[in-house]
Amino acid sequence: MSHSGADPEQRQQASEADAMAATFRASEHQHIRYNPLQDEWVLVSAHRMKRPWQGQVEPQLLKTVPRHDPLNPLCPGATRANGEVNPHYDGTFLFDNDFPALQPDAPDPGPSDHPLFRAEAARGVCKVMCFHPWSDVTLPLMSVPEIRAVIDAWASVTEELGAQYPWVQIFENKGAMMGCSNPHPHCQVWASSFLPDIAQREERSQQTYHSQHGKPLLLEYGHQELLRKERLVLTSEHWIVLVPFWAVWPFQTLLLPRRHVRRLPELNPAERDDLASIMKKLLTKYDNLFETSFPYSMGWHGAPTGLKTGATCDHWQLHAHYYPPLLRSATVRKFMVGYEMLAQAQRDLTPEQAAERLRALPEVHYCLAQKDKETAAIA
């Protein structure tokens, strides 16, 4: 239909009428989706995946990591920056970060002389947790019992630091693309005297939903995704892995327990075993997607601790976020710049397309499959 003779307002109205008459397809037409957990929107522009890529290409990292490097401060027996020598650990190893962003004895900034210049005290502790004594392994290449030991250590440090601090943030940055400067398998744990911004948003959203509907937001969300199935990646007896309806990063996933669980220490032995198994499968799929050690940032969110530990916090549901940056290949990543920084998040691949691709991937790591083929060829 031609609208060339109409005035601008008529053309706008006619254009809107044409758009309404068209059949909407999420995989072809741009739209915005709401994230009820963090009270924000994301622009989905799936048609952009058809454009040729002429942007930055990251170098492929083919460097072999030595199993043990005496100069690597995370290795067993190595000397760290503060002069302390690591024990010869053979499992997980937790220690105080030598360069902490939070310290327990920081002074109070005092009162502000103007409402536009507010500062408040920030205290806490920062720890580093090594997952394994070897530098040349990552979580998907570790055994299920080894991953289970990591989960137990996560639960223990949450309980320990949560006795004093209202928020304990466990997070892993994997890969140089995510700013990880050391290839040794490890995560960080920051406990703070305040509730960080994202935790505050999740607290408000879950509290509001629970007040309005009488059930935890993420527990209900998990049930709905099990019914709809199109965004599921993995399911097990106790856990669900899915690409959220509101995902921002290309292959972002959300890891949820099937039952109502508020914090990591509440997981029973069967749930911890099952979590180790499904984590290994998810991270193997990630690596298999582009046959690379898949970079990501991940972290756990649970009910606030400290003085809130004894509170019911029934609106909270434990969950883990995985935010991987890769989009088209092992060397092409998603950049959060421009529109994302100044307006709102935007993604190209739909969450349903991402989930379908992840679902279809094998659960045997490509490195192990390659070794099996080489062994068979020799035999």
From Swiss-Prot:
<comment type="pathway">
    <text>Carbohydrate metabolism; galactose metabolism.</text>
</comment>
<feature type="region of interest" description="Disordered">
    <location>
        <begin position="1"/>
        <end position="20"/>
    </location>
</feature>
<dbReference type="InterPro" id="IPR005849">
    <property type="entry name" value="GalP_Utransf_N"/>
</dbReference>
<feature type="binding site" description="in other chain">
    <location>
        <position position="188"/>
    </location>
    <ligand>
        <name>UDP-alpha-D-glucose</name>
    </ligand>
</feature>
<dbReference type="InterPro" id="IPR019779">
    <property type="entry name" value="GalP_UDPtransf1_His-AS"/>
</dbReference>
<feature type="binding site" description="in other chain">
    <location>
        <begin position="339"/>
        <end position="340"/>
    </location>
    <ligand>
        <name>UDP-alpha-D-glucose</name>
    </ligand>
</feature>
<keyword id="KW-0479">Metal-binding</keyword>
<feature type="binding site">
    <location>
        <position position="184"/>
    </location>
    <ligand>
        <name>Zn(2+) 1</name>
    </ligand>
</feature>
<dbReference type="InterPro" id="IPR005850">
    <property type="entry name" value="GalP_Utransf_C"/>
</dbReference>
<keyword id="KW-0548">Nucleotidyltransferase</keyword>
<feature type="binding site">
    <location>
        <position position="75"/>
    </location>
    <ligand>
        <name>Zn(2+) 1</name>
    </ligand>
</feature>
<feature type="binding site">
    <location>
        <position position="321"/>
    </location>
    <ligand>
        <name>Zn(2+) 2</name>
    </ligand>
</feature>
<dbReference type="GO" id="GO:0006012">
    <property type="term" value="P:galactose metabolic process"/>
</dbReference>
<dbReference type="GO" id="GO:0008270">
    <property type="term" value="F:zinc ion binding"/>
</dbReference>
<dbReference type="GO" id="GO:0033499">
    <property type="term" value="P:galactose catabolic process via UDP-galactose, Leloir pathway"/>
</dbReference>
<dbReference type="Pfam" id="PF02744">
    <property type="entry name" value="GalP_UDP_tr_C"/>
</dbReference>
<feature type="binding site">
    <location>
        <position position="319"/>
    </location>
    <ligand>
        <name>Zn(2+) 2</name>
    </ligand>
</feature>
<dbReference type="GO" id="GO:0006011">
    <property type="term" value="P:UDP-alpha-D-glucose metabolic process"/>
</dbReference>
<dbReference type="Pfam" id="PF01087">
    <property type="entry name" value="GalP_UDP_transf"/>
</dbReference>
<feature type="binding site" description="in other chain">
    <location>
        <begin position="97"/>
        <end position="98"/>
    </location>
    <ligand>
        <name>UDP-alpha-D-glucose</name>
    </ligand>
</feature>
<dbReference type="GO" id="GO:0061623">
    <property type="term" value="P:glycolytic process from galactose"/>
</dbReference>
<dbReference type="GO" id="GO:0008108">
    <property type="term" value="F:UDP-glucose:hexose-1-phosphate uridylyltransferase activity"/>
</dbReference>
<keyword id="KW-0119">Carbohydrate metabolism</keyword>
<keyword id="KW-0862">Zinc</keyword>
<feature type="binding site">
    <location>
        <position position="202"/>
    </location>
    <ligand>
        <name>Zn(2+) 2</name>
    </ligand>
</feature>
<feature type="compositionally biased region" description="Basic and acidic residues">
    <location>
        <begin position="1"/>
        <end position="10"/>
    </location>
</feature>
<dbReference type="InterPro" id="IPR036265">
    <property type="entry name" value="HIT-like_sf"/>
</dbReference>
<feature type="binding site" description="in other chain">
    <location>
        <begin position="334"/>
        <end position="337"/>
    </location>
    <ligand>
        <name>UDP-alpha-D-glucose</name>
    </ligand>
</feature>
<keyword id="KW-0808">Transferase</keyword>
<comment type="subunit">
    <text>Homodimer.</text>
</comment>
<feature type="binding site" description="in other chain">
    <location>
        <position position="81"/>
    </location>
    <ligand>
        <name>UDP-alpha-D-glucose</name>
    </ligand>
</feature>
<protein>
    <recommendedName>
        <fullName>Galactose-1-phosphate uridylyltransferase</fullName>
        <ecNumber>2.7.7.12</ecNumber>
    </recommendedName>
</protein>
<keyword id="KW-0299">Galactose metabolism</keyword>
<feature type="binding site">
    <location>
        <position position="301"/>
    </location>
    <ligand>
        <name>Zn(2+) 2</name>
    </ligand>
</feature>
<feature type="active site" description="Tele-UMP-histidine intermediate">
    <location>
        <position position="186"/>
    </location>
</feature>
<comment type="similarity">
    <text>Belongs to the galactose-1-phosphate uridylyltransferase type 1 family.</text>
</comment>
<feature type="binding site">
    <location>
        <position position="173"/>
    </location>
    <ligand>
        <name>UDP-alpha-D-glucose</name>
    </ligand>
</feature>
<comment type="function">
    <text>Plays an important role in galactose metabolism.</text>
</comment>
<dbReference type="InterPro" id="IPR001937">
    <property type="entry name" value="GalP_UDPtransf1"/>
</dbReference>
